[in-house]
Amino acid sequence: MTIAPEGRRMLRVEARNSQTPIETKPRWIRNQVKNGPEYKDMKERVAGASLHTVCQEAGCPNIHECWESREATFLIGGANCSRRCDFCMINSARPEPLDRGEPLRVAESVREMRLNYSTITGVTRDDLPDEGAWLYSEVVRKIHELNPNTGVENLVPDFSGKRDLLQEVFESRPEVFAHNLETVPRIFKRIRPAFRYDRSLDVIRQARDFGLVTKSNLILGMGETREEISEALRDLHSAGTDIITITQYLRPGPLFHPIERWVKPEEFLELSDEAYEIGFAAVMSGPLVRSSYRAGKLYAQALKFRGEELPANLSHLAETTEGPTTQEASSLLERYGASEDAPVIPRG
């Protein structure tokens, strides 16, 4: 029996993963830190009101840039997830009882932080009869109620593909409905054993048919091939995905899936061009891009592509579309120049 650092028995997959040492990062996996006035104001507000955001608690490398645009992400549903994905650092265990006061608290946090755009994500709640559909819906409703000038992106699990539960979430009408596919069919079951590739695509398809702006994410470096990435992009577009983010897998610790390869900025740039050629409305592609990174900018860009104007109450988001972002592959190549070969090397 193998014991995890916190004293519990390791899962077999964790024991296998732990045999591969943590990998050394290539030179382009680093972040620029700029503390602008909006970031400083947000930081003071968060500290003063003892607020909690994923941005801080997950140590997101993009916190300075997103907060400068007054965008932030919140995790709902508790600290424990009812499923386990091999790339995700959220604890997999029996979830806590449902906290019905959480939606109001999140909405009040959004108000205190004076956000332009908020992303809601959370754990799966297979323990609940509605799998958390009310919770994901209610937090959108409360944010809209208390913050009419704040956009809301709802990044949700699949609710087992149940149409009635998805319909409840759709009817809360977030500005963007997001469900992350994450990886390609061949390795999907190994990486996300409790999810299904086709079911995730169907979730996006249902959201598109409802009339929502849709979004998904692909994580690279977990064993997929270049051809498989292209196939997944085509599948996502066919399912009705408007916005796609593409990112490098960064291993949270030794119990998680080893990194199979470091994807160069040049390949991320190629994938961005390819995604636009396929027909996506908005694309963000780079090693340190995360699915909620500069989400307001992508929403505004997607509406423009669709020939729609920003709602009057969100017209301020038009300002976020100007200029490149720090983590786009094109920006990395500008800063660091052409990348060198970077094989996956265990940290010595």
From Swiss-Prot:
InterPro entries associated with the record: Aldolase_TIM, Elp3/MiaA/NifB-like_rSAM, Lipoyl_synth, rSAM
Positions annotated to bind [4Fe-4S] cluster 1: 55, 60, 66, 292
GO cellular component labels: cytoplasm
Principal location listed in the UniProt entry: cytoplasm
Pathway entry: Protein modification; protein lipoylation via endogenous pathway; protein N(6)-(lipoyl)lysine from octanoyl-[acyl-carrier-protein]: step 2/2
Pfam families the record matches: Radical_SAM
Co-factor remark: Binds 2 [4Fe-4S] clusters per subunit. One cluster is coordinated with 3 cysteines and an exchangeable S-adenosyl-L-methionine.
Named cofactor requirement(s): [4Fe-4S] cluster
Catalytic activity: [[Fe-S] cluster scaffold protein carrying a second [4Fe-4S](2+) cluster] + N(6)-octanoyl-L-lysyl-[protein] + 2 oxidized [2Fe-2S]-[ferredoxin] + 2 S-adenosyl-L-methionine + 4 H(+) = [[Fe-S] cluster scaffold protein] + N(6)-[(R)-dihydrolipoyl]-L-lysyl-[protein] + 4 Fe(3+) + 2 hydrogen sulfide + 2 5'-deoxyadenosine + 2 L-methionine + 2 reduced [2Fe-2S]-[ferredoxin]
SMART domains (alphabetical): Elp3
UniProt domain Radical SAM core: residue ranges: 67-281
Subcellular location: Cytoplasm
Entry superkingdom: Bacteria
EC numbers for this chain: 2.8.1.8
PROSITE patterns assigned: RADICAL_SAM
Keywords for this protein: 4Fe-4S, Cytoplasm, Iron, Iron-sulfur, Metal-binding, S-adenosyl-L-methionine, Transferase
Binding of [4Fe-4S] cluster 2, residues: 81, 85, 88
Main enzyme class: transferase
One MF term in the entry's GO annotations: metal ion binding
Family: Belongs to the radical SAM superfamily. Lipoyl synthase family.
Protein name (Swiss-Prot/TrEMBL): Lipoyl synthase
Record organism: Corynebacterium efficiens (strain DSM 44549 / YS-314 / AJ 12310 / JCM 11189 / NBRC 100395)
Primary gene name: lipA
